[in-house]
């Protein structure tokens, strides 16, 4: 009886792991839409209370005009910053200069505001971990 329980339990765990790794197909972007993909913190280490740059990679249908990027920790109000530049090379990204934050790990979420059909729209939200040293 115990071996059957363990077999069923291990099968359930394997199924849970397999389903959590499954990718969800992305819907195609509508004309003028922007979808954030990932972030990259620049530099070899972030020091407490020192500004730092973040690249935000995205995909877009057309040539979007990104107004600003907004960052927040869960439960806090977003702080929005102007986009420094947009790169349209093999990887599409824009860069934002962020002010210094306190020492420790931070789970930061980000979205961007962009112009589509003459209106300001918000992208999807992506999250990243930022570890700030002394």
What do these predicted ranges mean?
Residues 17-20:
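C-terminal motif of bacterial Sec signal peptides marking the signal peptidase cleavage site
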Residues 61-74:
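Solvent-exposed loop/turn segments flanking beta-strands in beta-repeat/beta-sandwich domains
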Residues 22-52, 57, 62, 133-134:
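Short, compositionally biased P/S/T/A/G/V-rich stretches that sit at domain boundaries
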Residues 98-105:
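Surface-exposed, short loops/turns at beta-strand junctions within beta-sandwich domains
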Residues 86-95:
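Aromatic sugar-binding surface patches on proteins
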Residues 114-119:
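Short, solvent-exposed loop/turn segments at the edges of extracellular beta-sandwich modules
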Residues 123-125:
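Short Trp-Ser/Thr-centered turn/loop motifs at beta-strand boundaries
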């Amino acid at each position: 009886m115990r071996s059957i329980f363990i077999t069923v339990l291990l099968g359930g765990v394997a199924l849970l792991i397999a389903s959590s790794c499954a990718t969800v197909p992305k819907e195609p972007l509508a004309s003028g839409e922007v979808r954030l993909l990932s972030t990259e913190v620049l530099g070899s280490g972030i020091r407490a209370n020192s500004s730092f740059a973040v690249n935000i990679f995205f995909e877009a249908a057309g040539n979007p005009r990104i107004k600003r990027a907004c960052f927040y920790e869960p439960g806090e109000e977003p702080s929005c910053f102007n986009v420094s530049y947009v790169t349209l090379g093999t990887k599409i990204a824009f860069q934002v200069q962020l002010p210094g934050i306190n020492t420790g790990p931070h789970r930061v979420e980000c979205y961007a505001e962009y112009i589509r059909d003459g209106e300001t729209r918000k992208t999807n939200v992506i999250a990243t971990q930022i570890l700030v040293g002394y």
